[in-house]
A protein has these predicted regions:
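N-terminal intrinsically disordered, cationic/polar leader segments
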Residues: 1-30, 40-113
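Short, conserved glycine- and acidic-residue-centered signature motifs
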Residues: 31-35
Length: 113
């Protein structure tokens, strides 16, 4: 399973993304490709448009991205995209966001608290 955790820190925002979608499951390769696309789009945007981006690969399948406050819109977009993926394929990806207080509802909507 892929896990994506969005948090705030003293500088801005952090995304910790780790794990792998299981290829044995029918959705595994699709979820892996979709999550990777969202992740690499986020990194590309932050690298070109935002200040102070840091990326650390702790091990294969375990990466941390940090950015300052100006990266918040891109982080939100990535979080929403990954949440939509998790709503469709909950067996392959989970998303936790303490950064904005978002929660998932049973009607497949994202709610801001």
């Amino acid at each position: 399973m892929i896990s994506a955790v969005f948090e705030r820190n003293d500088v801005g925002f952090v995304l910790r993304m780790y794990g792998h979608a299981e290829k044995e499951k029918p959705s595994g390769e699709l979820v892996c490709a979709a999550a990777s696309g969202i992740f690499y789009s986020l990194i590309g945007y932050l690298a070109n448009e935002c200040s102070g981006m840091k990326i650390r690969t702790l091990s294969p399948g375990n990466t941390v991205v940090e950015c300052r406050e100006d990266g918040e819109p891109a982080m939100k977009q990535a979080c929403i995209g990954l949440i939509q993926l998790a709503l469709t394929y909950p067996e392959s990806i989970e998303v936790v966001s303490s950064a904005w207080g978002w929660s998932l509802t049973r009607s497949n909507n994202i709610r801001l608290d």
